[in-house]
A protein has these predicted regions:
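Glycine-rich, small-residue loops and helix-cap segments
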Residues: 117
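NAD(P)-dependent aldehyde/semialdehyde dehydrogenase
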Residues: 1-114
Length: 117
């Protein structure tokens, strides 16, 4: 799967109350901080899109993002297998990508995980 073509323009974030919305708020301000801390403190990887809590107003309906806990869909490539983003559940709109040279490497790695994600 190739995520390199994604851009912020492809991803629409708004309130769950608007039927045209593609995404709503995360569960709480505390959880928003947890998601952002995991993204910020990663030891490797390049953010392709997202990576910062949403600020300002929605282009769809003018909703003020400060009235909720909004984190955009975030895609990060080349994340180290030792990074917490691989080892822990983010429970948020974050996808981490890693290229494996040989298919067998994937299975060896997956079986070392605490969670099968």
């Amino acid at each position: 799967m190739n995520f390199n073509h994604l851009s912020k323009d492809d991803l629409t974030h708004f309130t769950a109350m608007n039927p045209q919305s593609s995404m709503g708020s995360v569960i709480s301000a505390h959880h928003l901080q947890r998601i952002h801390r995991m993204v910020e403190t990663r030891s490797s990887g390049t953010i392709l899109t997202g990576g910062e809590p949403l600020k300002g107003r929605s282009s769809l309906d003018g909703f003020n993002f400060s009235r909720g806990s909004f984190y955009p869909p975030t895609v990060i490539e080349d994340v180290s297998l030792e990074d917490d983003l691989w080892k822990e559940e983010v429970f948020g709109p974050v996808v981490v990508l890693r290229k494996f040279e040989v298919r067998a490497e994937i299975f060896v790695y997956v079986y070392t995980l605490i969670y099968f994600v």
